[in-house]
Amino acid sequence: MMGSVLPAEALVLKTGLKAPGLALAEVITSDILHSFLYGRWRNVLGEQLFEDKSHHASPKTAFTAEVLAQSFSGEVQKLSSLVLPAEVIIAQSSIPGEGLGIFSKTWIKAGTEMGPFTGRVIAPEHVDICKNNNLMWEVFNEDGTVRYFIDASQEDHRSWMTYIKCARNEQEQNLEVVQIGTSIFYKAIEMIPPDQELLVWYGNSHNTFLGIPGVPGLEEDQKKNKHEDFHPADSAAGPAGRMRCVICHRGFNSRSNLRSHMRIHTLDKPFVCRFCNRRFSQSSTLRNHVRLHTGERPYKCQVCQSAYSQLAGLRAHQKSARHRPPSTALQAHSPALPAPHAHAPALAAAAAAAAAAAAHHLPAMVL
């Protein structure tokens, strides 16, 4: 796939598209402008679509990704030294706001591998989680722990693969990420026609998901119980949770949520307590822990004004008997309660303090 340079003729408008004497406004039609702004190609299946509708459309309304790339030659000329495979071209991405993308010029067979993905190697402890890391891929060890990250955010480390955008849904995905050895490759998961944008995301199979080992026998069990576990309600949630963890198969609707969840399996703990240096995999867990040092109790009961450092403590308190309306059936068969003791307020305060202390020891639910 690799080895050729972006052809020079792709950087200028074809003479057939611009008649002598026409102004630039007459060449860049409303259709071209609409495609540039909203990333919608009129001809997503190549020249065949234009041939079928040649009696309805003019050459200005049926164009390919290559023609559009030529129309915005000023943008592409900055990348004239970028090494591109002969089978692809760089043009405006079909995803709004994502800049340039990579499109196929010819048919690309299913199973075609592209790569390796290049960039600087970053250790897990040196990753800045506050930055946008969308040009970064994980490389895993055989035991599923993160070995390092490959970061292509710096221009001197970028290759043509950097401009391949992430798919937003299963329907538009045509590439998947695979790990071969300690290198990252993109693999075509279907036959890709000309003038289609290459869009990548994680593969559904745990065998191709960055080389993470799967759970032995899990795939066979899933096939066996496929019809038993199917529920119509679950199918509606499928598209929203298409990004699945290959360890526990939980679905997520964003790449950042999936990465955050993966720290549970990889034991990566980037969040450090400034008081005791204890490490946590989730920022929310760290916030709850820090409150034990600071004494902060932001969760307050509106009935008795008792305060708690964690939401779980408040919810446990609200479920206690004094927050429930008395049951008539229970009152009819229950013995009479003794009269309130003089020290009842002190005992109630002690009970509330004990409940708060117990809440501190409740195991945190990590999702």
Curated annotation (Swiss-Prot):
Region (Disordered): 318-337
Primary site of residence: nucleus
One GO BP: neuron projection development
Tissue and organ distribution: Not found in adult tissues except in dorsal root ganglia.
Highest taxon of source: Eukaryota
ZnF (C2H2-type) intervals: 243-265, 271-293, 299-323
SUPFAM superfamilies in the record: beta-beta-alpha zinc fingers, SET domain
Subcellular location, record wording: Nucleus
InterPro entries listed in its UniProt record: PRDM12_PR/SET, SET_dom, SET_dom_sf, Zinc_finger, Znf_C2H2_sf, Znf_C2H2_type, Znf_PRDM12
GO molecular function annotation: DNA binding; histone chaperone activity; histone methyltransferase binding; methyltransferase activity; zinc ion binding
Occurrences of domain SET (ranges): 86-203
UniProt entry keywords in alphabetical sequence: Activator, Disease variant, DNA-binding, Metal-binding, Neurodegeneration, Neuropathy, Nucleus, Repeat, Repressor, Transcription, Transcription regulation, Zinc, Zinc-finger
GO cellular component, one term: nucleoplasm
Recorded family membership: Belongs to the class V-like SAM-binding methyltransferase superfamily.
Assembly notes: Interacts with EHMT2.
Protein's job: Transcriptional regulator necessary for the development of nociceptive neurons, playing a key role in determining the nociceptive lineage from neural crest cell progenitors. Initiates neurogenesis and activates downstream pro-neuronal transcription factors, such as NEUROD1, BRN3A, and ISL1, specifically within nociceptive neurons, while repressing non-nociceptor cell fates. Essential for the proper function of nociceptors in adults, influencing both their excitability and their gene expression, thereby impacting how these neurons respond to various pain stimuli.
Annotated disorder: Neuropathy, hereditary sensory and autonomic, 8: A form of hereditary sensory and autonomic neuropathy, a genetically and clinically heterogeneous group of disorders characterized by degeneration of dorsal root and autonomic ganglion cells, and by sensory and/or autonomic abnormalities. HSAN8 patients manifest congenital insensitivity to pain resulting in ulceration to the fingers, tongue, lips, and other distal appendages. Some patients may also have decreased sweating and tear production.
Name listed for the protein in its UniProt record: PR domain zinc finger protein 12
Organism (species): Homo sapiens (Human)
Gene that encodes it: PRDM12
